[in-house]
Amino acid sequence: MGRKWNNIKEKKAQKDKNTSRIYAKFGKEIYVAAKSGEPNPESNQALRLVLERAKTYSVPNHIIEKAIDKAKGAGDENFDHLRYEGFGPSGSMLIVDALTNNVNRTASDVRAAFGKNGGNMGVSGSVAYMFDHVATFGIEGKSVDEILETLMEQDVDVNDVIDDNGLTIVYAEPDQFAVVQDALRAAGVEEFKVAEFEMLPQTDIELSEADQVTFEKLIDALEDLEDVQNVFHNVDLK
């Protein structure tokens, strides 16, 4: 695999200036996960995975507790998971994941964001085949060889382990998220810099300076939408 985890790096780099937006998105996702089963991460795997991801973004406990309490109590909102696919300038491709209580509103908003920023909505499947769905972990303080040895000793299969500027990145199948994380914890990993699900492009592209400006405006417009949870793309942003 060996590709950079650009989408996650960009999201984390923006955390300080977009803290409230990221926290709001996690609050919604935690509520949906808690409402889908028991509001207890010990018995609700979906909730556990969301909370593990939230830790890497330092989501405050009061936001987590508020979302879970809402799911326990009078919260009666129902949300749908939606995925949109589209194109930006010069062969750029985007996947937009949303969580919404109004499908028509979200579809209209996403289509408008594409149309006003040099992009076009595609049909389902027009882009996703160029991406791989993976669980991504980032670990400091342990080398690629150490992580590989740990995983082999515990008979845990992963897709790839690479070094990215001193951060060891582990790619695994999405359904192995908890298995891989538990194995790494058992080997002494106490903190994950990254613990995410990602749509990873099979090939990255580079854009001209002008196209990159347009593309970044498109990304910002999509991520600013209330219903959008994640935007993945195939552009190597400089």
Swiss-Prot record:
Keywords: Cytoplasm, DNA-binding, Transcription, Transcription regulation
Pfam family, one: Transcrip_reg
Domain of life: Bacteria
GO BP, one annotated term: regulation of DNA-templated transcription
InterPro entries tied to this protein: Integrase-like_N, TACO1_YebC-like_2nd/3rd_dom, TACO1_YebC_N, Transcrip_reg_TACO1-like, Transcrip_reg_TACO1-like_dom3, Transcrip_reg_TACO1_YeeN, YebC-like
GO MF, any single term: DNA binding
SUPFAM superfamilies: YebC-like (SSF75625)
Subcellular location: Cytoplasm
Primary site of residence: cytoplasm
Gene Ontology CC: one annotated term: cytosol
PANTHER family the UniProt entry points to: TRANSLATIONAL ACTIVATOR OF CYTOCHROME C OXIDASE 1
Family recorded in the similarity comment: Belongs to the TACO1 family. YeeN subfamily.
Protein name listed in UniProt: Probable transcriptional regulatory protein SAOUHSC_00675
